[in-house]
Amino acid sequence: MLRLKITNEQRQRISKKYTDNAEAYQLYLKGRHYQLKDTPEDLRKSRQYFEQAIDADPNYALAYGGLSEYYGFMGYSGEISPKEAWPAMEAAALRAAQLDPELAAAHRELAAVSLIAKWDWVTAEKEIKRSIELDPNDAETHFTYSMLLRTMHRFDEALREAKRAEELDPLSPGWKSHTALVHYYARQFDAAEERYRQLTHSDPDLPGPHLGLYNIYSRTGKESEAVAELQKGLTLQGADELAAALPRVYASSGFHAAREFAVREQLKILTDASRQGYISPVAFATNYALLNDKDKAFKWLEKAFEEHTPGMLDLDLDPDYDNLRSDPRFRDLVRRMNLPQEASAVSPGVQLVEFEPDRAKTD
């Protein structure tokens, strides 16, 4: 899942080889080389090498572990559908754990399967704790644990694990972004803003921190700042036409109109992209929720529920769904996912800036 780094355990196991087959060993190393580049194209190359390593040595646990990580990353990022990703991820992780019960990465990936694909929170925590016991210095493992904890509304613990991932891999912006997101989901907007602002300075080419600031400002009444950050984020994403049009709509019609314009344009982009490949249903659901089109939002959320889309982990956390929280269908989804119903992601007194009802009509 997400960024992949070589840990102490992995260095030891690579040096140990775990196979007497020189060809399998070299193929595995090539797979790790491409996996660490962390782009979809390179990850696809890594899969080919891991599969070739397994062909050369069917009992090579490390190669199965690498293959499981590939499917986890591609499924989590939406490069391939959950239907394709999760069974393959689980099968590879189970085989790795069978071949080497003390391979920490195998337990981490089994935890990720339980978390993302099965919504089995108890098993996920059991497996992630076992992984940390075997290798306490893997940033990816602490990130995965933080994801589980934030899903459970255990925000203090989630932040502890997120910051541990940062300590272990301080150069990765991914862990810093995750820490900011935990603050945001906990409605700790000041802390989230500080984190995102730091990222705009340390990693200026990333769109995510600007979009994170947009989300914060749009919910705290800082309209001009929100538009500016959204424009920057869209530009970095390559949506130049939308980015250029946004300030004009804001100047002529105000913030609500500009925000609605951006959401509708995003829906057009998503619809076009879905004709070419897989797009997560959550992407549609969040935009329709922002438009206050509840029926369409729940239609896409039901599809996401059926697929076990990764974004469903944020269902009871994401402020984008605040328009839906009073609807019985929302609480029913939370119940069916076995999420903690006694907790509420919405803190009393938080002012939210949403669309006016008369602007919420959809085509």
Tell me the role of every PLM-derived stretch.
Residues 294, 298-317:
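Eukaryotic low-complexity, mixed-charge intrinsically disordered interaction/regulatory segments enriched
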Residues 1-5, 9, 49-52, 304-307, ...:
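Structured segments of extracytoplasmic/periplasmic soluble domains
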Residues 108-116, 140, 144-151, 174-181, ...:
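Alpha-helical adaptor scaffolds
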Residues 1-237, 318, 361:
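Acidic, proline/glycine-rich low-complexity intrinsically disordered segments
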Residues 278, 315-363:
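Terminal, low-structured helical/coil segments at or just beyond the last alpha-helical repeat
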Residues 243-256, 312-328:
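TPR/TPR-like alpha-solenoid helical repeat scaffolds
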Residues 227, 231-240, 302-309, 338-339:
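TPR/TPR-like (Sel1-like) alpha-helical repeat modules
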Residues 289-294, 330:
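C-terminal substrate/ligand-recognition segments
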